[in-house]
Amino acid sequence: MDPVRPLFRGPTPVHPSQCVRMPGCWPQAPRPLEPAWGRAGPAGRGLVFRKPEDSSPPLQPVQKDSVGLVSMFRGMGLDTAFRPPSKREVPPLGRGVLGRGLSANMVRKDREEPRSSLPDPSVLAAGDSKLAEASVGWSRMLGRGSSEVSLLPLGRAASSIGRGMDKPPSAFGLTARDPPRLPQPPALSPTSLHSADPPPVLTMERKEKELLVKQGSKGTPQSLGLNLIKIQCHNEAVYQYHVTFSPSVECKSMRFGMLKDHQSVTGNVTAFDGSILYLPVKLQQVVELKSQRKTDDAEISIKIQLTKILEPCSDLCIPFYNVVFRRVMKLLDMKLVGRNFYDPTSAMVLQQHRLQIWPGYAASIRRTDGGLFLLADVSHKVIRNDSVLDVMHAIYQQNKEHFQDECSKLLVGSIVITRYNNRTYRIDDVDWNKTPKDSFVMSDGKEITFLEYYSKNYGITVKEDDQPLLIHRPSERQNNHGMLLKGEILLLPELSFMTGIPEKMKKDFRAMKDLTQQINLSPKQHHGALECLLQRISQNETASNELTRWGLSLHKDVHKIEGRLLPMERINLRNTSFVTSEDLNWVKEVTRDASILTIPMHFWALFYPKRAMDQARELVNMLEKIAGPIGMRISPPAWVELKDDRIETYIRTIQSLLGVEGKIQMVVCIIMGTRDDLYGAIKKLCCVQSPVPSQVINVRTIGQPTRLRSVAQKILLQMNCKLGGELWGVDIPLKQLMVIGMDVYHDPSRGMRSVVGFVASINLTLTKWYSRVVFQMPHQEIVDSLKLCLVGSLKKYYEVNHCLPEKIVVYRDGVSDGQLKTVANYEIPQLQKCFEAFDNYHPKMVVFVVQKKISTNLYLAAPDHFVTPSPGTVVDHTITSCEWVDFYLLAHHVRQGCGIPTHYICVLNTANLSPDHMQRLTFKLCHMYWNWPGTIRVPAPCKYAHKLAFLSGQILHHEPAIQLCGNLFFL
């Protein structure tokens, strides 16, 4: 074999699956979909119509053919068949929510909503439906259907955008309101199949709902634009019918054809999945039709029965509208990749970095407090010109001895795209014992090699016939007959291309600058891209007709509302205080005035390799100069020169010094270049094995004399925090308050176990913090873990203040909308149960869910165009959720791109905090992150929890030592 090519075949043991499949070769078993959770309201919140008074008996649904809400979602590509319960009996802590709460000044009535049953597949209409499995979030539906000219197949539609990929629960229930009571139809006229009667007078039946008080008043009004386009619904209703074929017609395409033959009855605007039919017009209650089966000339009776009348703006119609809009995007020649649509023909090529950038859109229809909107965001897909095979060759050249291990380490977990079908897959493993010359069995029972498959189906000639195969393991799902499908999808490295930004490129400032110039659009450019999309829809007759046929129309521009700019906050130092400037940056003040609390650093050690001696001395000299202004006393360190920069040298030397000198306050290490392995080894030693605050400094950051002063100031402030110092604070009017931040890191290299970061304030000014880490295994209960964290923080609070907090505010990061109700009664009761550890202790509690990965953009309306809003901009109406008390806050200064706010959902409020108090407190906490003298996107405890969880999960793989929990050692 050529010595420059990697030796792919090897003795690595492999455990092949019982079923090996290729994408596209199993027509009856659709490809797996990775659902993303949306942000619209939940299914089953629509309006239900009822005739005012009618003595006729109510319409009885057909018992055999299960219809209603479940059938509706089944018709849209959603599998509602029974699924066995997941092994995970307890919802994972990651990306969940702490619960749903209400302001104490709200009037709330407990109500029960009937849950629709999940029918067994055997009682549903027969057919070889190609609908793929999906799970229902609040506004997400997935599936796949076949395309016909006059029929809009339902399926594989995502009704909301997400920036992340979340795993669905193993089973779900759909909540619906009472089915409508429809009057008995008059006798069917043989001459008229359409209803000639005037539309029935329908009254909206809505269960009593609490009034959500969510609007504040503090701040300066501002005119804002949003990346939402108002949608008007012109139809009276959307009518759902159940279609029965007698005798049964098994072939789905044949059922499509038979129904298509009766367009004179149904009209040419239909959406049909084989059993459920949606029309914008109302037919008679029951319509009987006849068709002739072409295969055997048998006469088939078709019965179309009205089952549901859906109000156009109801939540039940939103998934359906997203199907329609997805069809519109396809008519614009946009290619679906993942959940978004892209235009590969307009790709921007960065040849010097071997990258392509595909422009596109992420779009979904959602219902908010302001009505029905299209949420459209500009999206970019970064595609590398290098195939996975090219990456393998490069790895082989660098490390032939450990080639397979290095390949697996780099590739597993990566997302690749196969350009022959524009589908993305996550690499779960590499099969070193299989090559394209191996064969697999297709769904029709025929055996074919991978070489033959790609040549026959895509006209692709595979050049490398001894390359290994990539393994993608889709989640378990059911086919159309309720059978559980398992297996692996095998991909060719030669035909799979890496996506995303390479890690090496992320550390290249110039490369990232070139990339961000292409993908970070200004508000004016972002608005222009949305205008371009609206123009393309209006100018494309087929696309605009697709919306018009269903009674939908888009406004010609983005929606404009009024927001507020919150007042600027006062920053408090030891001897001075000041109001922040408009750009919310106070780096000058914190480096020339004394911090609130500084810890003298008398016993510290500096470890450095011999070739970094000059940089080490310059750093210490600068630290001594700048320590005075911030009020910190610093003594000369114990100088420890290392003979080399090997990991063993650092670890052995640090251990020996810590063993001799028991009073070391801080370990400072200077390392040569970016060394993740060395950094991890030092942190494991200092955070787990021999707990001591540590600071690791890259020699490059202190190698430029012109920047040394500013770098040294940041280093010294950070070291003060790690020793237990306090830098600055803000005015907190709430007394006896504890603030908690929680975030979750998922460790992909260790079975996707979750690492929970928990950070709580333990003094009255919110400047002293207590932290804990919880490692959560997939099947492990978290009751004891949360109790350990919260009870420990309450005890620390009592030690500092000699009392327990009266109010506790929790900011829970890492949550998607699809899991709000799933975990609503799971984490909050656990937190509240912790109070039982103290006698007669019942504090008031407020819980916020913090969502950063959202697609909502804010524009500030300038005289001639949109600009970036100022920090402190808040929106608490129109775009807010119909179900929760929530608001959007842009707290940080945006230097590039659009203003993407953070979404805060209040899920519990027993402290009676008003909307103004919620928003002001949240904005204040965004000033309290001591790693940056300015505001950040999320409250400081959330950011601290994120840093802690990342360090523990990515670097330490272990809980930090308890001795460090009282300081911010993880900064």
Curated annotation (Swiss-Prot):
GO cellular component entries: chromatoid body; cytoplasm; cytosol; dense body; nucleus; P granule; perinucleolar chromocenter; PET complex
Domain Piwi, chain residue ranges per copy: 666-957
Posttranslational modification: Arginine methylation by PRMT5 is required for the interaction with Tudor domain-containing protein TDRD1 and subsequent localization to the meiotic nuage, also named P granule.
GO molecular function per UniProt: metal ion binding; mRNA binding; piRNA binding; RNA endonuclease activity
EC number(s) from the headed UniProt entry: 3.1.26.-
Enzyme active site: D743, E781, D813, H946
Phenotype upon changing R45K: Abolishes interaction with TDRD1
Consequence of changing R9K: Abolishes interaction with TDRD1
Domain PAZ as annotated: residue spans: 387-500
Enzyme class per UniProt: hydrolase
Keywords for the protein's UniProt record, in alphabetical order: Biological rhythms, Cytoplasm, Developmental protein, Differentiation, Endonuclease, Hydrolase, Meiosis, Metal-binding, Methylation, Nuclease, Oogenesis, RNA-binding, RNA-mediated gene silencing, Spermatogenesis, Translation regulation
PTM-bearing positions, type Symmetric dimethylarginine: R45, R74, R83, R95, R100, R144, R156, R163, R549
Region span, Disordered: 102-124, 159-200
InterPro entries linked to this entry: ArgoL1 (IPR014811), PAZ_dom (IPR003100), PAZ_dom_sf (IPR036085), Piwi (IPR003165), RNaseH-like_sf (IPR012337), RNaseH_sf (IPR036397)
Subcellular location: Cytoplasm
Cofactor dependence: Mg(2+)
Bilayer-spanning residue ranges: none
Organs and tissues of expression: Expressed in adult testis, specifically in spermatocytes and in spermatogonia. Only detected in primordial germ cells of both sexes. Widely expressed in tumors. Also present at early stages of oocyte growth. Present in the mitotic spermatogonia. Not detected in the first stages of meiosis (preleptotene and leptotene). Detected at the late zygotene stage and increases throughout pachytene, declining from this stage onward until expression stops at the early round spermatid stage (at protein level).
Disruption phenotype: Mice exhibit blocked spermatogenesis at the early prophase of the first meiosis due to transposable elements derepression, and apoptosis occurs subsequently. Female mice are fertile, while male are sterile.
One GO-annotated biological process of the protein: regulatory ncRNA-mediated gene silencing
Quaternary assembly: Interacts with DDX4, MAEL, EIF3A, EIF4E, EIF4G, PRMT5 and WDR77. Associates with EIF4E- and EIF4G-containing m7G cap-binding complexes. Interacts (when methylated on arginine residues) with TDRD1 and TDRKH/TDRD2. Interacts with TDRD12. Component of the PET complex, at least composed of EXD1, PIWIL2, TDRD12 and piRNAs. Interacts with MOV10L1. Interacts with GPAT2. Interacts with Tex19.1 and, probably, Tex19.2. Interacts (via PIWI domain) with BMAL1 and CLOCK. Interacts with GSK3B. Interacts with TEX15.
Family named by the database record: Belongs to the argonaute family. Piwi subfamily.
Role this protein plays: Endoribonuclease that plays a central role during spermatogenesis by repressing transposable elements and preventing their mobilization, which is essential for the germline integrity. Plays an essential role in meiotic differentiation of spermatocytes, germ cell differentiation and in self-renewal of spermatogonial stem cells. Its presence in oocytes suggests that it may participate in similar functions during oogenesis in females.
Protein name: Piwi-like protein 2
Species the sequence originates in: Mus musculus (Mouse)
Gene name linked to the record: Piwil2
